[in-house]
Regions:
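Juxtamembrane intracellular "pre-TM" segments in multi-pass secondary transporters
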Residues: 1-17
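Helix-loop boundary and gating motifs at the non-cytosolic
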Residues: 12-19, 23-41, 45-50, 118, ...
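Hydrophobic core of transmembrane alpha-helices in multi-pass small-molecule transporters
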Residues: 21, 87, 100-117
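Loop-to-transmembrane helix entry/capping segments in MFS-fold secondary transporters
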Residues: 44, 129-142
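Helix-to-loop junctions at the C-terminal end of transmembrane segments
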Residues: 60-73, 161
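C-terminal ends and interior cores of transmembrane alpha-helices
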Residues: 82-96
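Intracellular juxtamembrane helix-capping segments at the cytosolic ends
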Residues: 116-130
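Symmetry-related core transmembrane helices of the 12-TM Major Facilitator Superfamily/SLC fold
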Residues: 216-227
Length: 227
């Protein structure tokens, strides 16, 4: 990876690498706390709901060659970065009134968020790196994104969750105890309920409102950072 550091002499690559690292800081918010968020909003099978993102990722992965020709590397990376901002804003503003379509749309954006930024970024790195250091350049990109970026991100996101959401979310989870089916489900049954949301009308409105307000505040932070 030492030889690949010389690529930082190229301003465009240096900007790309720094931006990639910075984008991965708010990315940790999504990876760490989306499941908690979905359960608090009322989704019965949060893990299954998040597979919408993986489905979207596969779909857009197949379309990358098409968009690569039509849009080019820079536009695709820019769209990917903007998609991250939009996702966090959808989560933030979908929280207070539990607007389900906004939350689902935010999850479905994963294909654009990941493929347009990260996959295209790897393709860009592979394209501009000299053949002799191509593997080192790819390793350096992983180090800056999934290494430095996510490490900082998990620390920042964890601290923010503890200071903003943790207390009110714990109160909400206690109030939600017993709501919905408690039966054990097979994997297929869990996937079939990826869109299912519990009715939270029986939950104390003050507890629910406070928790959702805190989730709104929580998701605003990564939206600002990604912007």
């Amino acid at each position: 990876m030492v030889d690949a550091i010389s690529m930082f002499k190229r301003p465009a690559f240096a900007v790309f690498m720094i931006c990639s690292c910075l984008v991965c800081i708010p990315l940790a918010y999504y990876y760490s706390f989306t499941s908690n968020y979905l359960r608090s909003v009322g989704f019965t099978q949060a893990a299954s709901t998040m597979t919408i993102g993986q489905m979207s990722e596969i779909f857009f992965m197949l379309l990358i060659p098409f968009f690569f020709r039509k849009l080019g590397v820079k536009n695709m990376i820019l769209i990917g970065m903007l998609a991250w901002v939009l996702r966090y804003l959808l989560f933030a503003f979908g929280a207070e009134e539990q607007v389900i379509w906004m939350i689902l749309f935010g999850i479905a954006l994963h294909g654009i968020c990941y493929d347009f930024f990260f996959v295209t970024g790897f393709m860009y790195t592979d394209k501009i790196a000299p053949k002799s250091i191509r593997s080192q350049a790819q390793s350096m990109l992983v180090f800056f994104t999934q290494g430095i970026g996510l490490y900082i991100g998990y620390k920042v996101a964890g601290d923010k969750f503890s200071s903003v959401v943790k207390e009110s979310d714990a109160a909400l989870n206690t109030a939600m105890a017993g709501i919905g089916s408690q039966d054990e489900l097979s994997t297929g049954e869990q996937l079939a309920q990826m869109f299912s949301v519990n009715d939270l009308s029986e939950v104390d409105s003050n507890i629910l409102s406070t928790a959702m307000s805190k989730w709104n505040e929580f998701w605003i932070y990564p939206a600002i950072m990604a912007g």
